[in-house]
């Protein structure tokens, strides 16, 4: 069985639990104390989650884990089969991970301010436009784009009050939306209703 190492409220772990459930894969979810990641370090050589164990192979870093799952368990697919569309999705993932996440990280680290907050807030219109006439970010079906973005964007609409992670509090404060972004609101609720691996 697949084994996924996690900490509570991890956005990057939720990317993987969504993908696993979408692919119908069973996994054992192993939760670690955020303040003691020694077991994660021993297993993977680094302290970040998610870390996936799959038949003796250890994979860390959520984009790499998503790619691993797609390669080893290709159905149902998280990437379009068309070469051009698949490349477009890769560009979106790279933009989200390297560009979109920069402002909230800067704010959480105390080095960001008004400019970063405006960038973060301004990105909501981009997602609203992507969802015009379609239920998911890249069309009619769930893809790696939804798995990648949802765990972060959701904080503008839904969150657990017990989650006091500073980065997440930044998202709650600067991404709040509702009727002003109706398509985005529907998308968050649509993906939020999807199962996750490890759900009891």
Language model features: what each stretch is:
Residues 1-129, 135-137:
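GST-like domain detector, emphasizing the conserved glutathione-binding G-site
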Residues 41, 189-192:
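Alpha-helix boundary recognition
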Residues 66, 87-90, 148, 185, ...:
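Generic structural signal for individual residues within well-ordered alpha-helical segments
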Residues 96-190:
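GST-like fold's C-terminal all-alpha helical module
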Residues 192-200:
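Long, charge-rich low-complexity segments
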